[in-house]
Every structure is written in C-alpha cells, then in structure tokens.
Amino acid sequence: MSSRGKRKDEDVRASDDESETHAPAKKVAKPADDSDQSDDIVVCNISKNRRVSVRNWNGKIWIDIREFYVKDGKTLPGKKGISLSVDQWNTLRNHAEDIEKALSDLS
C-alpha cells in the first residue's frame, strides 16, 4: 500500500474518533488606533476636502498633501495625494522660486 493511501486512511480514522467539531477561529477586529492621527499636525486646509499635514508614520516624518472624505462622521484620508519625505520637501521648497516664475510666465 502506498503511503498516500495509508495517510488518507489515518485521517479518516482520526476524524471518526473526534466527537467534537471545531468551528473556524473568529477574527477579532483590532480596535481603532487613533494614535497615528494624534501625531498629525494639520498645517492648512487648501480647500474643502484637501489639506496639508505633517505626520510621523513608521518612525519617519512626512509632509502629506491629500484629499479627505467623510465616512460615518469621521474625516478619513483618501487615495489621492502625495506624501513627501523631509528631503523631498526641502527639494520642492528650494525650487519654489522657479515654480513661482513658471506660474507668472504662464499667467
């Protein structure tokens, strides 16, 4: 007899011996952790649904420019937006004059 058939027979006998049936484990929802939001510093609201904030996430500081939406009375971040590292923010800030010049050239 092959080991494959033998193992199957053992499994059948083992399940016959068990008088209890085990229900799958229930998933327990994690409690909402607002500690991430407490690290957010809202710098300004750009429009009704857009804001700039500085936050600490995974031990790093990020400048977050993002759209938000309201669900069940809570304001939540949406997918549309960008999170800049401090280095990226400094690069953008150093080019602010170039951006202003390009805006004035197009106006």
From Swiss-Prot:
Xref: InterPro entries: PC4_C, ssDNA-bd_transcriptional_reg, Sub1/Tcp4-like
UniProt xrefs under SUPFAM superfamilies: ssDNA-binding transcriptional regulator domain
Family: Belongs to the transcriptional coactivator PC4 family.
Organism in which the protein naturally occurs: Arabidopsis thaliana
Positions of region (Disordered): 1-40
GO molecular function: DNA binding; transcription coactivator activity
Keyword field: Activator, DNA-binding, Nucleus, Transcription, Transcription regulation
Gene Ontology annotations for the cellular component aspect, listed alphabetically: nucleus
Function comment: General coactivator that functions cooperatively with TAFs and mediates functional interactions between upstream activators and the general transcriptional machinery. Binds single-stranded DNA.
Compartment(s): Nucleus
Protein known as: RNA polymerase II transcriptional coactivator KIWI
Pfam families referenced in this protein's UniProt entry, alphabetically: PC4
Residue ranges, compositional bias (Basic and acidic residues): 7-23
GO BP terms: positive regulation of transcription initiation by RNA polymerase II
Superkingdom of the organism of origin: Eukaryota
